[in-house]
Amino acid sequence: GGKKILAVGDLHLGYEEALNIQGVGVGRMLFSEMIKDFEEIFDKIGKVDEVVLLGDVKHVFGSVLQQEKEDFRKLLEFFGERCKKIVIVKGNHDSIVGFFIRERTEVRDFYIVDSVCFLHGDRDFKEIWEEKITTWIVGHAHPAIELSDGVKSERYKCFLGGKWKGKKIVVVPSFSRYSEGSDVLRGDLGLVWGVDVRKFKVLVVGEKLKVLDFGEVGKIK
């Protein structure tokens, strides 16, 4: 009878506009594709109690682009119709995300629900080490796995799950289609705690939201 929570990895809204400003014409398809992806997820899981955004909601560090504002407002409306509350965990790109906020929306450095803590992963907080907290759900690292058949290699975003220092940790991939992610087989994920993920499981979400288990990071060739 617990809460039903959808945790969402780094969105990096405003990425297209940042590229367009730099002269890389990428159009405006990305946001509508993102909404389609979310529609597919909600079709499968139904309404939730809360949506938790795990930080780096916006892409451009320290400034607010018009497109970001517009997209963010639409996204909050979209989520607002499908949940009771939205929690935004601040990421390293989100220094000024506060003024976007509307009713039923909170901004936190980290967010604790029962024994689960949602946080970005770029900063440490003493509260997250309390004994009652058994699980961390984190963003920031953008995990992905690169698989090669000898001819071509493809990169797939993945979830990582495992135990470290007595905590169960789930690392959530970036939700942005432009962010390919960092290959977990090539070393450090950039999380503030320097987590050793070699024994963590790699889970890739495939077509029709089917979950594929690739086993432990350290055993993948």
Q: Whereabouts are the PLM-identified features?
A:
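Extended recognition/assembly regions associated with phosphoester-bond processing machinery
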Residues: G1-L53, K58-K221
